């Protein structure tokens, strides 16, 4: 694939589609009506800003953004610095601690350093009303994120998709397993993590696959940005 191919090239035309305009208009109207919508407007498309199409090595699919204050910032499972790691992320850290030698559980939940290394942290729905999980499901975001997955499937090779839980696994049905790698496990939520997420070893498996294909492994130790 040409190194210059960007998200703008392959999904930029979605911005002109009626469904996408309607989704953005609905979210804008909700904000204008005084409702608190997460993440903040400038963070909604962060996953694409931080991980360009030609840089994607791993995709971790989430469902919809966290709906508590100061949590969501456009990356699945990640929270802003200074906010405690939510329960699913605590379980992700538990798994990393047993899977990756030397992993130290961080005192934060900010996963931007993963995104900067080529881990696309993609929620299938990109906004949510405060305190109201799944409130923005079926607005049109799913159509958009299906197009994102289709673009990765078509324009990239050897991407590792981590599909945790039935929702992500259903979303991943379109992925060509001849060209890409799929790692499946239950969701890391406390309701299901003990059914096989804990012990799945997805993080070490991903790094083995990357190294087998001549790529840099991911440093899974989340790092806060250093002060300039």
Curated annotation (Swiss-Prot):
Organism: Yersinia enterocolitica serotype O:8 / biotype 1B (strain NCTC 13174 / 8081)
Name of the gene this protein is made from: ung
Localization terms from the record: Cytoplasm
Record keywords: Cytoplasm, DNA damage, DNA repair, Hydrolase
Gene3D superfamilies: Uracil-DNA glycosylase-like domain
GO MF annotations, alphabetized: uracil DNA N-glycosylase activity
Active-site residues per Swiss-Prot or TrEMBL entry: 64 (proton acceptor)
PANTHER family given in the database record: URACIL-DNA GLYCOSYLASE (PTHR11264:SF0)
Annotated family: Belongs to the uracil-DNA glycosylase (UDG) superfamily. UNG family.
SUPFAM superfamilies: Uracil-DNA glycosylase-like
The EC number(s) this enzyme carries: 3.2.2.27
Entry-linked InterPro entries: UDG_fam1 (IPR002043), Ura-DNA_Glyclase_AS (IPR018085), Uracil-DNA_glycosylase-like (IPR005122), Uracil-DNA_glycosylase-like_sf (IPR036895)
Record GO biological process: base-excision repair, AP site formation via deaminated base removal
Catalysed reactions listed for this entry: Hydrolyzes single-stranded DNA or mismatched double-stranded DNA and polynucleotides, releasing free uracil
HAMAP family per the UniProt record, alphabetical: UDG (MF_00148)
Protein name per the record: Uracil-DNA glycosylase
């Amino acid at each position: 694939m040409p190194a210059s191919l960007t998200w703008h090239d392959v999904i930029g035309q979605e911005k002109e589609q009626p469904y996408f305009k309607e989704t953005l208009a609905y979210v804008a109207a909700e904000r204008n009506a005084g409702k608190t919508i997460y993440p903040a407007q400038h963070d909604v498309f962060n996953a694409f800003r931080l991980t360009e199409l030609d840089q994607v090595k791993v995709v971790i699919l989430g469902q919809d953004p966290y709906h508590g204050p100061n949590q969501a910032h456009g990356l699945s499972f990640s929270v802003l610095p200074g906010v405690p790691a939510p329960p699913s992320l605590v379980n992700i850290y538990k798994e990393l601690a047993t899977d990756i030698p030397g992993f130290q559980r961080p005192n934060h939940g900010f996963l931007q350093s993963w995104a900067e290394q080529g881990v696309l942290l993609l929620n299938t729905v990109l906004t949510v009303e405060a305190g109201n999980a799944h409130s923005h499901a079926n607005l049109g975001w799913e159509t958009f994120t299906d197009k994102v997955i289709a673009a990765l499937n078509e324009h990239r090779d050897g991407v590792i998709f981590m599909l945790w839980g039935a929702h992500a696994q259903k979303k991943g049905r379109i992925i060509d397993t001849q060209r890409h790698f799929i790692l499946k496990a239950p969701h890391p939520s406390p309701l299901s993590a003990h059914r096989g997420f804990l012990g799945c070893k997805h993080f070490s498996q991903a790094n083995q696959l990357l190294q087998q294909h001549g790529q840099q492994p991911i440093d899974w130790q989340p790092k806060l940005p250093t002060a300039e």
